[in-house]
């Protein structure tokens, strides 16, 4: 998350690559391409960030991966796992990623939304396009509910933690098939999705292991989780003795209550 960068739309004086071996190799021409450009606009699409520049047809596509983050500093103090350093006017912007699943790519601004990363991406969960009518266009599918919510071509940016929390809030089982849902249940999914995401944003996201927000702050929504990572603990909605269950779906952990999520 690039909280804070929008306030520092400064000229890039130079870019230094400390380690090029991220998910994709850092472009060798990164410094040459970006030197003296001014950041003018920052967009988010799903889990991707896009940086645009004044008087340039180039843009940057950035993915933070599992553990990546940016930090702004007044002076260069390098830390372990720093990979790319952007020297701005009066500020230094540093990309750090412990697991190196993140990446930085250069694209032409007219091609970026047609890139393999973005072209098939679904609607934004907080946008008006995510609604009953949109959901109904997928309603004949026989996939399970959580699987659809995790599908980036259906809805952009939802991760494993939030899917479990959304379905708990909507009182729906992650195992339900899409073609079994009625209109009321779909409306509840849409409503719960927007509710949980807005609440998570207000708490700065969710820090489980390594995730931090800019300026190296953690996300406090971890303290508000009602089902995720609470397996074998009492359901916060049901009576005592009803425990949260953990299962595996498509290789990912899912947490839910068998009693109140139907």
Predicted regions and their residues:
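A feature for loop-to-transmembrane-helix boundaries and adjacent hydrophobic helices
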Residues: 136, 164, 171-175, 234, ...
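Basic, amphipathic alpha-helical segments enriched in Lys/Arg and hydrophobic/aromatic residues
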Residues: 185-202
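Short conserved catalytic/interaction loops centered on acidic-Pro-aromatic/His motifs
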Residues: 173-185, 202-209
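C-terminal accessory segment of soluble enzyme catalytic cores
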Residues: 201-262
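Phosphate/anion-contacting hairpin/loop surfaces
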Residues: 53-157, 162-169, 177, 184
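A cross-family signal for N-terminal binding/gating loops and helix N-caps
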Residues: 1-104, 227-228, 233-237, 250-262
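Short coil/turn segments at secondary-structure boundaries
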Residues: 13-16, 147-153, 206-212
